[in-house]
Amino acid sequence: MPRALWPAWVWAIIILSMEGASDKASSLSCDPTGVCDGRSRSLNSIPSGLTAGVKSLDLSNNEITYVGNRDLQRCVNLKTLRLGANEIHTVEEDSFFHLRNLEYLDLSYNRLSNLSSSWFRSLYVLKFLNLLGNLYKTLGETSLFSHLPDLRTLKVGNSNSFTEIHEKDFTGLTFLEELEISAQNLQIYVPKSLKSIQNISHLILHLKQPVLLVDILVDIVSSLDCLELRDTNLHTFHFSEASISEMSTSVKKLIFRNVQFTDESFVEVVKLFNYVSGIVEVEFDDCTHDGIGDFRALSLDRIRHLGNVETLTIRKLHIPQFFLFQDLSSIYPLTGKVKRVTIENSKVFLVPCLLSQHLKSLEYLDLSENLMSEETLKNSACKDAWPFLQTLVLRQNRLKSLEKTGELLLTLKNLNNLDISKNNFLSMPETCQWPGKMKQLNLSSTKIRSLTQCLPQTLEILDVSNNNLDSFSLILPQLKELYISRNKLKTLPDASFLPVLSVMGISKNIINTFSKEQLDSFQQLKTLEAGGNNFICSCDFLSFTQGQQALGRVLVDWPDDYRCDSPSHVRGQRLQDARLSLSECHRAAVVSAACCALFLFLLLTGVLCHRFHGLWYMKIMWAWLQAKRKPRKAPRRDICYDAFVSYSERDSYWVENLMVQELEHFNPPFKLCLHKRDFIPGKWIIDNIIDSIEKSHKTIFVLSENFVKSEWCKYELDFSHFRLFDENNDAVILILLEPIDKKAIPQRFCKLRKIMNTKTYLEWPLDETQQEGFWLNLRAAIRS
């Protein structure tokens, strides 16, 4: 390789290594508490750089194949490690040696073909271990869990290759809360293999065939609380009385999940109930009965009862030969001690009257998600049926008439709790009949639009959630709990109708607000759920909700579910956090203050205008604007006068008898414009002044004390003032008729005062010998 290429190769290797390190670093997202998430990142190894700060590490659903001794050695504070759903086939002996604080370890669904006890020898505080779904055939040659004294949950086995359970496998385990064994292909079970475990709260067995089931039961029946059998075909199951009859049993509950029965194997299971006397609860979930219910030929009549079974639960029972199934009359006598029955989502459309009458101890019956209607309910709730029944659940069946349903249940004298939710009642009649002891009624999701006096007055708990109600105005004097969420209510119900109400759920309606007075009116209210409404966050409402510290103890969903819908600028904010401006909360005060401020402003403006002649400035501005709309200077042909004379009426004698005589009778004569004779009648005075000044070659101001005091003289002087300084000409002639103090001229005529200070003006002489010279100078000024 040429020497010149070596630097390029070195840089490429460095860059690739940096990118690899960057990818590793970015493969995990860790929060400040040390919880790191690396799920589904396509990782093929455990990320490097893990430190003692990591307390929880989730690397499930990746492509990791190998766990080395050094991969986790710095994670000394790790408590949770999830490595499930990877491709791990090798775990080195000391991979978990430094994880002495580990409490949760998941190695499920990998490719481990061998298990080693050395993996767990330092995990003294481990509580949860999942080894399901790997490839091992056995649990190893030595005791795998002997170093795990605190282990409480253990999951082992797989669905294919796990075939053997030996006596040593569970040595060292004395108490387990949950043990799950997946052994669909189990071929060898050495007796007493599970007997070493002194107590198991819940055992889950995945067995495909029941061949070894009885052997396992013999070992655990005295140490087990709950047995759950999954994915098992019990077609060939046969129960041997001799194997269990003389042993003390502790099993209290049996669960069959996804299990297949025949008529024969069902009878064998019923026998088991009799001999395992501690069983009080039996559950069938998603099971299949491959039979027609013909138990008479199977000696079922020899069995007098179901042992001590009090609770029977059946969910999603499949009967392929449903239309050939018999009436089950042979099992009626076995049901006398049963107190609680749940048959859910199993296509039940009828409980025969005779069976109902045999259920003499029944207190709770749940027939949810079935096909019960009023016609079949009439037969089921016949006379003497379910004499001690207290709770009946008929949720999501085919009931349509509320009136008829209540009437059919009158035979149930002890019924106090009825759930008929998710039926299509649509409406509620005005009156109904109900059992006399009714205290709880669930009518949620029944599409009713209004409530009537049909409801029993004895109710203590009522649920009418998720309907189309827009009001609640019923008087229920004994009602303690009301659930009316997901309706269309605009306000809280009237407290006088519900005097003893202590719990109310009214969330997700269209309530805009509620007040302290409303809440206080419910004198016994302890719990209110009102979140999810469209609250208008007014100042009063926010002040109430934010100022009541005790409100959080009443509102169970406070504060997260209480959010503003309006005003728009606080929409989505929690009531606790929303803030409104001062103007929104104290509008009257703000308007009053604004009015006062406006009044003071106008008053101050008036004073300032009076003091600094503001009105005059406005008038002169208007006159100036009017003048600006006309040509700046009239064409020469429009000049009609030699001079416009502005004077005070009190100086008219001097103007008319002296000035006019001297100028208009001179040869050649001057043509003067005087307001008395030349203003156009009917025309605005201000327009006359403007036109006269513009049509005059000069403007003569006869100044005197009277002139300064004259309002119209001021207007004439005002416009001339603008003309003088806007057109920048010398069209103004000042005649001082009598001596006046320059200070008497208003300050606003600053330009005029400046002219008087800088230019010569004509002063009328009192000496007659000098008057001829005055007229001579005036005529010369006009001609200039």
Curated annotation (Swiss-Prot):
There is a cross-link at K754 (Glycyl lysine isopeptide (Lys-Gly) (interchain with G-Cter in ubiquitin)). A motif (ATG16L1-binding motif) lies at residues 761-778. This is Toll-like receptor 2. Cooperates with LY96 to mediate the innate immune response to bacterial lipoproteins and other microbial cell wall components. Cooperates with TLR1 or TLR6 to mediate the innate immune response to bacterial lipoproteins or lipopeptides. Acts via MYD88 and TRAF6, leading to NF-kappa-B activation, cytokine secretion and the inflammatory response. May also promote apoptosis in response to lipoproteins. It is found in: Membrane; Cytoplasmic vesicle, Phagosome membrane; Membrane raft. Belongs to the Toll-like receptor family. SUPFAM superfamilies: L domain-like (SSF52058), Toll/Interleukin receptor TIR domain (SSF52200). Its main location: membrane. Interacts with LY96, TLR1 and TLR6 (via extracellular domain). TLR2 seems to exist in heterodimers with either TLR1 or TLR6 before stimulation by the ligand. The heterodimers form bigger oligomers in response to their corresponding ligands as well as further heterotypic associations with other receptors such as CD14 and/or CD36. Binds MYD88 (via TIR domain). Interacts with TICAM1. Interacts with CNPY3. Interacts with ATG16L1. Interacts with PPP1R11. Interacts with TICAM2. Interacts with TIRAP. Ubiquitinated at Lys-754 by PPP1R11, leading to its degradation. Deubiquitinated by USP2. It comes from Boselaphus tragocamelus. Residues 21-587 are extracellular. Residues 609-784 are cytoplasmic. One of its GO terms (cellular component) is plasma membrane. It is a single-pass type I membrane protein. The keyword Repressor does not apply. Residues 1-20 form the signal peptide. Keywords: Cytoplasmic vesicle, Disulfide bond, Glycoprotein, Immunity, Inflammatory response, Innate immunity, Isopeptide bond, Leucine-rich repeat, Membrane, NAD, Receptor, Repeat, Signal, Transmembrane, Transmembrane helix, Ubl conjugation. The gene is TLR2. Gene3D superfamilies: Ribonuclease Inhibitor, Toll/interleukin-1 receptor homology (TIR) domain. Residues 639-782 form the TIR domain. One of its GO terms (molecular function) is NAD+ nucleosidase activity, cyclic ADP-ribose generating. Glycans are attached at N114, N199, N442.
